[in-house]
């Protein structure tokens, strides 16, 4: 079975998570080009799992376009991982504080993979919330 470890992280506070498997790496996606909801007072104490932040990112950003592209990349990788009997894939999403955009993106990818693949186990970790 393929285990996909998904992380959200902060470039500012702790950097890219280390892959603890023998593979030594994975995909890293930078969400900092998406408008930061944390710049608005009403979102400062919320995170990418909160409804208000989700609604904001759904309606006021290019997040879905970015995620659609990422889903295509990950689908291609997953197929190759299946063919080659690989057992671990690591995918990380970073933003400035690791609270809004990266959390949202990691949650969306986790949901996408869980709904699309019954033969994948996902492990989701938010390093800054």
Regions found by a protein language model. Name each.
Residues 107-116, 120:
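Conserved helicase motor "Helicase C" RecA-like lobe of SF1/SF2 P-loop NTPases
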Residues 7-9, 94-96, 125:
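Short hydrophobic segments within beta-strands
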Residues 118-129:
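Short beta-strand-centered segment that lines the nucleotide-binding/catalytic pocket of NTP-utilizing
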Residues 74-81, 95-99, 113:
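Short leucine-rich amphipathic alpha-helical surface patches
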Residues 1-89, 128:
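C-terminal accessory "lid"/substrate-recognition subdomains
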Residues 87-110:
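Catalytic cysteine-centered active loop of the rhodanese-like fold, especially the PTP/DSP P-loop
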């Amino acid at each position: 079975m393929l285990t996909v470890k998904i992380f959200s992280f902060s470039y500012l506070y702790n950097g890219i998570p280390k892959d603890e498997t023998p593979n030594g790496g994975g995909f890293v996606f930078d969400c900092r080009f998406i408008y930061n909801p944390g710049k608005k007072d009403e979102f400062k104490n919320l995170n990418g799992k909160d409804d208000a932040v989700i609604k904001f990112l759904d309606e006021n950003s290019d997040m879905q376009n970015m995620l659609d592209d990422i889903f295509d990349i990950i689908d291609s990788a997953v197929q190759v991982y299946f063919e080659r009997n690989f057992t671990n894939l690591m995918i990380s999403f970073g933003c400035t504080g690791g609270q809004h955009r990266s959390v949202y993106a990691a949650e969306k990818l986790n949901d996408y993979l869980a709904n699309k693949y019954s033969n994948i186990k996902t492990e989701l970790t938010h390093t800054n919330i």
